[in-house]
């Protein structure tokens, strides 16, 4: 019956997100158009433009499509978890606190998605493409991560160490919450960077959710697979809109929501270290940017480590199309899933 719950969650997530996509595309385009009109009035008239001015670019796809994912996942998880609890009522009173772990992971993802929503709104309403100020965004992300850690700590579900291949379990003591906090915030920033190319975050997260379902089965957390199953179904539907060239973009609300899922779900089952291989494409994206900045600052702007950063921009400069970059990142995501499964097997 648990398998039926997972199938129901993924199926509902797919159809609900697909339906919401049809509804959200015109609504978001109209919403963003309201804020684009004042900017268009301030733009120079065609008579004032130079004769060799660039031709007008086609309108960009609407953003904030991550709202479709959030609504679809909430409904699908609700139905799937209800079906699982009806099939196995002991899940509600289990000593492993299945319901607490599931709700905490879901809340954490929604909190990170809320931070992304604020940034999208700030980006749309203002003329700045950066959205929220960096310190404001990092503070909100840290607060979202702290809420998750406090809830898990109060219920005694917070992992105090990590499992290293060949070493075994290593107790981190008081440093564990600080490490998990840094992990969640860093993952959110990396996912935000990866959202610069159509389909990357959506496609890689889909592969990660499939891998996470398998890993949770290996580790004995099969009932909580309802959460990644629902998200996998929703992501499959959203790819209909987000595959390059995108008709609807995730936006920061979607990318941070997915980062919250990738970080909070392993953390809530006591295996936060699985996030490292599971989110491999995101770490590569953020890692390239971090290295580029460090080298540039160390050389006082005279040297760059890479021709361009992050990874998807570097691949773009090497002549790869958007579709090729999408498939490249999917291969990297599958490699991360394989590493995650191996880590779960040997731990």
Regions found by a protein language model. Name each.
Residues 346-347:
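Cytosolic-facing loops and C-terminal tails of multi-pass membrane proteins
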Residues 322-343:
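Final/C-terminal transmembrane alpha-helix of multipass membrane proteins
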Residues 2-284, 340:
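"…together with the soluble PPM/PP2C metallo-phosphatase catalytic core" -> "…together
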Residues 22-23, 29-51, 281-328:
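Membrane-proximal soluble regions of multi-pass membrane proteins
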